[in-house]
């Protein structure tokens, strides 16, 4: 049996749960319970704060978990966890920012003794030390953007996705500390256990199959027999398109193929030009 730690709230919680459900790992949640069972009796779920998950997995409380790369660095657990997968979403950057009217425009303008407010004291301290800077770090638990305007700090170190929040709060970016995405991580001892690692790899495989399918589409059509060669040349598919007879029409063939989502518009245009008809483009839930 393995225990999977998932964020109990926040912007990555919903998409992660949706991916697991598409992978076939439906979670049975009862009220506000901190634990839940999945359709697989050998996989149990624990809901926790995303910031605590790196330590829970490192310490073996959970065998595998989903968290942000920034949170792994904050808890200084990066080297102690087995990195299994980058979900490629939940993108954010941890940046140092200053008020728009500040004389600090780059990291070179930051001076020893300045105050910096952050929800990431560990990561901020290590980064500043690497830059040879000694600042007073003020740990806050939210609303970091207000700190410079109420005399709490000179600078902030906070997460941003688009930079819009910084601009709305009259702040300017001074330095990019680290870029972060959502990660799947595992306990190293659990990965050394044959039974647990096998189950963890099942979870990993399921997630990968969903993520891979997100960028693909199944395209189906009926096409003239004399155009099949041209049509199959523009939809190579995965291992080649599937071509089959249409019982009610001996002049047409049915063709199915998997194509990249970003090529759908161009492909459909070319297929219509070649005489394909009854074209269907369908999302795919999983590709294994």
UniProtKB/Swiss-Prot annotation:
Q: Could you tell me which PROSITE patterns the record lists for this protein?
A: ATP_P_PHORIBOSYLTR (PS01316)
Q: In which pathway does it act?
A: Amino-acid biosynthesis; L-histidine biosynthesis; L-histidine from 5-phospho-alpha-D-ribose 1-diphosphate: step 1/9
Keyword Nucleotide-binding found: yes
Recorded catalytic activity of this chain's protein: 1-(5-phospho-beta-D-ribosyl)-ATP + diphosphate = 5-phospho-alpha-D-ribose 1-diphosphate + ATP
Q: What is this protein called?
A: ATP phosphoribosyltransferase
Q: Which cofactor does it need?
A: Mg(2+)
Q: Which Pfam families match?
A: HisG, HisG_C
Q: Name one GO biological process term.
A: L-histidine biosynthetic process
How's its activity regulated?
Answer: Feedback inhibited by histidine.
Key word Electron transport present: no
Any one cellular component term from GO for this entry? cytoplasm
InterPro entries attached to this UniProt entry = ATP-PRT_HisG_long (IPR020621), ATP_PRibTrfase_cat (IPR013820), ATP_PRibTrfase_CS (IPR018198), ATP_PRibTrfase_HisG (IPR001348), HisG_C (IPR013115), N-reg_PII-like_a/b (IPR011322), N-reg_PII/ATP_PRibTrfase_C (IPR015867)
Q: Which Gene3D superfamilies match?
A: 3.30.70.120, Periplasmic binding protein-like II
| Localization per record | Cytoplasm
Question: Keywords on this record?
Answer: Amino-acid biosynthesis, ATP-binding, Cytoplasm, Glycosyltransferase, Histidine biosynthesis, Magnesium, Metal-binding, Nucleotide-binding, Transferase
Q: Which NCBIfam families match?
A: hisG, HisG_C-term
Instruction: Give the main EC class.
Output: transferase
Could you say which residues form the signal peptide?
none
Family affiliation: Belongs to the ATP phosphoribosyltransferase family. Long subfamily.
Q: Name one GO molecular function term.
A: ATP binding
Query: Which species is this record about?
Result: Methanococcus maripaludis (strain C5 / ATCC BAA-1333)
- E.C. number(s) listed in UniProt: 2.4.2.17
Q: What does this protein do?
A: Catalyzes the condensation of ATP and 5-phosphoribose 1-diphosphate to form N'-(5'-phosphoribosyl)-ATP (PR-ATP). Has a crucial role in the pathway because the rate of histidine biosynthesis seems to be controlled primarily by regulation of HisG enzymatic activity.
Where is this chain primarily localised?
A: cytoplasm
